[in-house]
Amino acid sequence: MPVKTFRPLTPSSRYVTYADYSDITKTKPEKSLVETRKRTGGRNSYGRCTARGIGGGHKQKIRLVDFQRKKHGVEATVKAIEYDPRRTARLALLEYQDGEKTYIVAPSGLQVGAKLMSGPSAPPEVGNSLPLRTVPVGLPIHNIELIPGRGAQMVRTAGGTATLMSRDEGYAQIRLPSGEIRRVNENCYATIGQVGNAEHENVILGKAGRSRHLGIRPINRGVSRNPVDHPNGGGAGKSKSGGGWQQLTSPWGLLAKGYRTRNKKKYSNRFILVRRDGRPMKNA
């Protein structure tokens, strides 16, 4: 899917790029697979902001995506490739032989009319969901479970792909897009192939209005605020930009650069063999 660019006739069109949506085959979602949900604006039940930078935006219907693929051994046909406003990847509408319809994250190269299947006996082809114990080593995979039966939790974004490196003692070693190498139970399911819409990374919003349309609010720098509002606020000029004694922090005082917030005793550390930065995990 290519990206459209424009002549700089206006300041907002100078750098903006759009997806051409040529891969979309159906514009309206399946009614039985959508629901509405009231927006929170990043506020909790007390009305306090718990997630900054969220608010406004166009109304969006939630597509109910099947991340578990529990209909094992039943063949499904791809009926359409659809747009989902709440994720970067496209969705594929499947219709099973018994008439049931579901959405899945559309892998790259999936075409309308393709036949898909899930389960241990499914062939290792693009779009099929298999347990890691039956996936051939070296294949690209996505939609990976962390706990058997919970549903896919990793590698679901546009263009995402992981690689099955090896299997040993009931675990599969997977190289994630971040570079991390992690052990996952070989009974966990994964989908063959790469997530589609890989050109999404080349889309440039180009103007503030597109961010607001997506529900993204402006982010204000702490250095530009007053001392009462942020630990880095105040001063003449850029006196608190991280030089000298001043440490850049979050609004709540946590160091912003280099400070590790992950718990050193986190239970899942034992499953990480190589970290994202390429260094081996100490307790692996």
Where are each of the predicted segments found?
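Basic, glycine/proline-rich low-complexity segments that contact nucleic acids
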Residues: 1-87, 108-284
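Short acidic-glycine loop/turn motifs at beta-strand connectors
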Residues: 96-99, 177-178
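Soluble periplasmic/extracytoplasmic beta-strand elements of cell-envelope proteins
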Residues: 93-95, 173
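S1/OB-fold single-stranded RNA-binding interface
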Residues: 89-93, 101-103, 152
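Beta-strand/loop nucleic-acid-binding surfaces
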Residues: 99-111
